[in-house]
């Protein structure tokens, strides 16, 4: 749209969970590498990469709380010119368990952990309610402004 090229970096873990590869959840280093490689291969090919699984989540999900992994993730994240949006959960929408390894309460706990992580690391983000038309237009305008288009 309007001369902006984009692609989607799909959530790698979701594919693995559909394959019943549950053990992979325990290795955030592996998952980070897979997700980061997708971004790396796309970054020079398109203007915009859209993802529902930013690499920051690997630090949020890292049960070992490894400071070296966190530093690496933040370093890689900061190599990109990011716009980060947190989409608030709509209580009227049923939570889909398929392709996820936590239930709704677990997902809400991750939401809170993510917000704390972003705050602790002074990472800018915007919160939006849903991904409907108005919010899509807002995001698109912000992308255009960032790209000077």
Functional labels for PLM-detected ranges:
Residues 1-38:
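Conserved substrate/cofactor phosphate-moiety recognition/catalytic segment
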Residues 7, 48, 84:
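Hydrophobic "anchor" residues on beta-strands that sit immediately upstream
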Residues 10, 51-53, 87:
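Active-site flanking residues adjacent to catalytic metal/cofactor-binding acidic residues
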Residues 16-19, 65, 140:
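Anionic, Ser/Thr-rich low-complexity intrinsically disordered regions
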Residues 30-79, 94:
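Glycine-rich phosphate-binding loop used to anchor ATP phosphates in small-molecule kinases
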Residues 32, 36, 136-140, 144:
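Short, amphipathic alpha-helical "lid/cap" segments that border enzyme active or binding sites
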Residues 65-134, 138:
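A glycine- and Lys/Arg-enriched "phosphate-lid" helix/loop adjacent to the NTP-binding pocket
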Residues 124-126, 140-149:
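C-terminal accessory "lid"/substrate-recognition subdomains
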């Amino acid at each position: 749209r309007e001369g902006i090229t984009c692609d989607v970096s799909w959530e790698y873990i979701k594919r693995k969970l559909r394959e019943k590869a549950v053990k992979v959840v325990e290795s955030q280093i592996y998952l980070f590498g897979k997700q980061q490689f997708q971004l790396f291969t796309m970054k020079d090919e398109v203007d915009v990469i859209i993802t529902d699984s930013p690499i920051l989540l690997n630090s949020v999900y890292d049960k070992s709380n490894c400071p070296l992994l966190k530093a690496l993730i933040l370093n890689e994240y900061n190599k990109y010119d990011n716009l980060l949006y947190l989409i608030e959960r709509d209580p009227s929408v049923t939570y889909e368990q398929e392709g996820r390894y936590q239930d709704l309460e677990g997902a809400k706990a991750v939401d809170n952990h993510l917000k704390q992580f972003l705050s602790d690391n002074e990472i800018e983000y915007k919160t939006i309610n849903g991904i409907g038309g108005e919010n899509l237009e807002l995001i698109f305008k912000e992308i255009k402004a960032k790209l000077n288009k």
